[in-house]
UniProtKB/Swiss-Prot annotation:
<dbReference type="Pfam" id="PF24997">
    <property type="entry name" value="PSF1_C"/>
</dbReference>
<comment type="subunit">
    <text>Component of the GINS complex which is a heterotetramer of gins1, gins2, gins3 and gins4.</text>
</comment>
<keyword id="KW-0235">DNA replication</keyword>
<dbReference type="InterPro" id="IPR056783">
    <property type="entry name" value="PSF1_C"/>
</dbReference>
<comment type="similarity">
    <text>Belongs to the GINS1/PSF1 family.</text>
</comment>
<protein>
    <recommendedName>
        <fullName>Probable DNA replication complex GINS protein PSF1</fullName>
    </recommendedName>
</protein>
<dbReference type="GO" id="GO:1902983">
    <property type="term" value="P:DNA strand elongation involved in mitotic DNA replication"/>
</dbReference>
<dbReference type="Pfam" id="PF05916">
    <property type="entry name" value="Sld5"/>
</dbReference>
<comment type="function">
    <text>The GINS complex plays an essential role in the initiation of DNA replication.</text>
</comment>
<keyword id="KW-0539">Nucleus</keyword>
<dbReference type="GO" id="GO:0000811">
    <property type="term" value="C:GINS complex"/>
</dbReference>
<dbReference type="GO" id="GO:0006260">
    <property type="term" value="P:DNA replication"/>
</dbReference>
<dbReference type="InterPro" id="IPR036224">
    <property type="entry name" value="GINS_bundle-like_dom_sf"/>
</dbReference>
<dbReference type="InterPro" id="IPR021151">
    <property type="entry name" value="GINS_A"/>
</dbReference>
<dbReference type="InterPro" id="IPR005339">
    <property type="entry name" value="GINS_Psf1"/>
</dbReference>
Length: 191
């Protein structure tokens, strides 16, 4: 069946919200299929010039052409979705370095894309003077209650206040002061 491998690529992404391993084998197999379909299309068109207006040959050529386009659309959708997930990872994690477990699942081009995207985002953040990845949603409350999960001792917050963050203590602090501590797992937001 034509386009079977390409459709499997799309199904592979649907099965998870994370970024699966880059499926180089299926991409290459789909491209090889596209080349073979193109050669069959050219062969059908050139060998049957006198019969090219007959419905059978027209439908034959249209089938090859549509299969090539479907393969191409599936590959582009696969790659686009992976890039969207890479961008989403950068925004949600706030990290400018890829962890090894994620890096091994990406192709070289995707790793390069992440680096370039990170440079653009970091440069933009520095020009604006804000880290836009910290809170993509506006906060509902200015102060939040947090519990200390990792012993930090005395900490000076962004606002200039000093607070003693001892293990298992709870505090009512300004959200903007402790967002990074919540993100890195030192504090836990108590709801």
């Amino acid at each position: 069946m034509f386009t079977k491998t390409a459709i499997e690529l799309i199904k592979e992404l649907r099965g998870t919200d994370s970024i699966p391993h880059y499926n180089d084998t299926s991409i290459k197999a789909t491209i090889d299929e596209m080349i073979a379909l193109y050669e069959d299309l050219i062969k059908t068109i050139t060998e049957h010039k006198e019969q090219k207006k007959e419905p059978f040959y027209l439908q034959h050529a249209i089938t090859f052409h549509n299969s090539i386009n479907r393969d191409k659309r599936c590959i582009l959708a696969y790659l686009n979705e992976r890039l969207n997930r890479i961008k989403e990872y950068r925004w949600s994690s706030g990290q400018s370095l890829l962890p090894d477990q994620l890096k091994e699942r990406l192709s070289q081009n995707e790793i390069q894309f992440f680096s370039e995207y990170d440079k653009i985002l970091t440069e933009y953040n520095s020009k604006v003077g804000l880290d836009l990845t910290i809170d993509p949603q506006p906060p509902k409350e200015l102060y939040i209650e947090v519990r200390v999960i990792k012993e930090l001792g005395e900490v000076v917050l962004n606002s200039g206040c000093t607070v003693n963050l001892n293990l298992n203590t709870t505090h009512f602090l300004k959200r903007s002061d402790i967002t990074n501590l919540v993100k890195n797992g030192s504090l836990e937001h108590i709801i």
